[in-house]
Amino acid sequence: MFFHGIFLPWVRRFGAWLFWPALAVVAWGELTPHPPRLEGPLMWDKLDHFTAYFGLTLLASLGWGLRRSLVWVFLGIVALGGVLEILQTMVGRDGEWGDFAANDLGALAGLGVAVAYLAIPRRLPADRDRV
């Protein structure tokens, strides 16, 4: 509990700083005409989208999210996913509803993890003795 209170400012800075390069990588991956593909048993297009938007939402929520603004962070990431899916059609790729759904589910999962982390009490309860 006490650990969380000490490191929350660092977690917020980390999220805010890493969001921008992560956003650039996601935008590049979605808008490049021939994105690189990894091979393997878990390499599935929808998993890529889920993971990317999970990370973006987690970083943005930890970096800038206060309880009242987390909904706006989530809606902004969802809107970003929609815009990038539309822009894909302009660079010779296919925008898909399945990709948009995977983006949204990833964003929702990232928001859930951020909310769980931010809900951890920052201080020890007053009636507990410190050891």
Protein language model annotation of sequence segments:
Residues M1-F100, D104, L108-V131:
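Bulky hydrophobic segments
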